[in-house]
């Protein structure tokens, strides 16, 4: 079984996510809450290796 990955909708994020496991906000897929919330409150990064969004 192959899974189709999509890029996280957070523009600077480098992560690819499985839509069935991603955070869905208004039809856009995000890798984590920080990205889905637009990094409000000064949150930086998603915590995934190699990504500095």
From Swiss-Prot:
UniProt superkingdom: Bacteria
GO molecular function: metal ion binding
Protein keywords: Cadmium, Copper, Metal-binding, Metal-thiolate cluster, Zinc
SUPFAM superfamilies for this protein: Metallothionein
Family: Belongs to the metallothionein superfamily. Type 14 family.
Job description of the protein: This protein complexes cadmium, zinc and copper.
Descriptive protein name: Metallothionein
Lineage, opening ranks: Bacteria, Bacillati, Cyanobacteriota, Cyanophyceae, Synechococcales
